[in-house]
Amino acid sequence: MSKQDVIEVEGTVIEPLPNAMFRVELQNGHKVLAHVSGKIRMNFIRILAGDRVMVELSPYDLTRGRIVYRYK
């Protein structure tokens, strides 16, 4: 899957889950299960409930995503 195939949306972290997973509510009201991307993990960026994040969704499974950016 190339970079141009992903769907980028903004959302808010509702709750942290085990194994670096998070439940994120998107701006359109949908709730997705998202994991942290490798670059965020490498740079030790903490993500807490209430944070605004950018999520990449695959067009094949719109219920799961990857957190690629945490807004300040």
UniProtKB/Swiss-Prot annotation:
UniProt-listed PROSITE patterns: S1_IF1_TYPE (PS50832)
Any one Gene Ontology molecular-function term assigned to this protein's record: translation initiation factor activity
Residue intervals of the S1-like domain: 1-72
InterPro entries: NA-bd_OB-fold, RNA-binding_domain_S1_IF1, S1_domain, TIF_IF1
Record flagged with keyword RNA-binding: yes
Localisation per UniProt entry: Cytoplasm
Gene3D superfamilies: Nucleic acid-binding proteins (2.40.50.140)
Protein role: One of the essential components for the initiation of protein synthesis. Stabilizes the binding of IF-2 and IF-3 on the 30S subunit to which N-formylmethionyl-tRNA(fMet) subsequently binds. Helps modulate mRNA selection, yielding the 30S pre-initiation complex (PIC). Upon addition of the 50S ribosomal subunit IF-1, IF-2 and IF-3 are released leaving the mature 70S translation initiation complex.
PANTHER family assigned to the protein according to its UniProt record, in alphabetical order: TRANSLATION INITIATION FACTOR IF-1, CHLOROPLASTIC
Protein name as annotated: Translation initiation factor IF-1
Organism: Pelotomaculum thermopropionicum (strain DSM 13744 / JCM 10971 / SI)
Lineage, opening ranks: Bacteria, Bacillati, Bacillota, Clostridia, Eubacteriales
